[in-house]
């Protein structure tokens, strides 16, 4: 392999997704969060068995393919979900609880699960097809959840943000293919 070809390949591997379209859902290459520009790290499709549940995109300050580094960074980040089918709030919260148990076990688990009750009012009883949900972490403010047809709720602290973002990026994500997409792989 020539040096030029090797350099071009390295650049392609190191360059994050600039914009994406997943299952007909467009993800812009950047979004503004609290005066900071977050870049699209990657996007993918959440499936449950063979059913398409939502298209999801991950936005971060500094794009990376390192899931642990993204979760650990005390920097703004966002996951945008656009639902491709109707999903009940209880299903969303159950999925988050399951993710907490798999990715954040230990003595703090009970407190993390209890904090889910604080975001529940932001999620409507049913997220209809086409509904959007944003999960945004901002240092010093916490994690804010906003959903179409719902409200807005914020949970303070980075620990909750880490646990929630591990649902997509942890060692045991809800969907490996979605994780790979969000990491631009």
Q: What are the language-model segments listed below?
A:
Residues 1-4:
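Positively charged n-region of N-terminal signal peptides that target proteins for export
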Residues 6-14:
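Bacterial N-terminal signal peptides
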Residues 15-19:
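Sec/Tat signal peptide C-region and signal peptidase I cleavage site
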Residues 20-72:
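N-terminal structural module
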Residues 27, 36, 54-56, 75-79, ...:
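Envelope-exposed proteins and targeting segments
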Residues 64-140:
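Mid-length scaffold segments of soluble, non-membrane domains
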Residues 146-150:
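Short strand-turn-strand beta-turns centered on an Asx-Gly dipeptide
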Residues 152-178:
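Flexible glycine-rich active-site/ligand-binding loops centered on an Asp-His dyad
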